[in-house]
């Protein structure tokens, strides 16, 4: 009897070819598109995998391949678990990655649960990554896709063993050009469809405007720009509009190439400094998930990535706080260690695990020195004779 697999079809070339490859491999395929765009999105809104046109593309591909296709309403679930999370973290001075959250909670938790109702024990997506089971330990492993330019293992680091055991990534052994060529051979209209480069629920990538429109009653409180010595050198618009490493859009000329080196949430301050000050060698991470190992018991040398686009860098990870957090110490300074972003650990092509960056341990927030108020002419300063 054929095994049934639910394929998450976004209307793009990757998920379309995923469905085709699984058919060729002898699976019974059910195509599913998740309806997750916000309820208040305009009818013609485009947002990558969330747009209405993407659903139509997925339907057409499923029809051409001869597989059933369903649209599942995940709006409320996505709203609560991804969009609200994104806003909450930004308002708290963090820089979250909503795609990582979506992968774990929506695609590989919510969709897996729905797949059982459709008679499928497994799901498949068009991610460029690999899964295999270690014959010695029995653990499921997550590996880089062979196309280094498209590898998505970083954004999948928080998958559980259960999720990995029930997931297929057919594209992990292919390059993107090979997938486009395969789509063309199959006569799929999406063969040349461009990749989505946006956060799906923020089509124009303007997250600042998104926050202002979504939280109109929230006071984006202005506060001080301060230098590394704590001197107040300007006024910012509100912490959610800045992120570590940012140079453009600061809104103030400082007389030198200025970068955001930290957000001081307690004092509502943005710390500014030169490019060199953005770098650090040590960070603290928590909210850990381990894949290749059951847990970290002793220091381990790995390659670590502190953002999706970063190159892996040699580091030693050491457990702290009874193993609920790790200190990551890099061999060389890393630029823009950003609280809220993921740090992912590799050995060779395989993901060891990862977590969420709490803070740059090499950075000490300055004590803010507010300027003395200027005396008003003709008025004696209080306490003086």
From Swiss-Prot:
Its main location: cytoplasm. Transmembrane segments: none annotated. Gene3D superfamilies: Adenine nucleotide alpha hydrolases-like domains (2.30.30.280), HUPs (3.40.50.620), Translation factors (2.40.30.10). Residues 150-152, 307-308 are annotated as: Interaction with tRNA. The keyword RNA-binding applies. GO terms for molecular function: ATP binding; tRNA binding; tRNA-uridine 2-sulfurtransferase activity. The keyword Glycoprotein does not apply. InterPro entries: MnmA-like, MnmA-like_C, MnmA-like_central, MnmA-like_central_sf, Rossmann-like_a/b/a_fold. CDD domains: MnmA_TRMU-like. It is found in: Cytoplasm. The active site is at 102 (nucleophile), 200 (cysteine persulfide intermediate). Disulfide bonds join 102-200. One of its GO terms (biological process) is tRNA wobble position uridine thiolation. ATP binds at residues 8-15, 34, 126. The record marks 127, 341 as: Interaction with tRNA. This is tRNA-specific 2-thiouridylase MnmA. It comes from Heliobacterium modesticaldum (strain ATCC 51547 / Ice1).
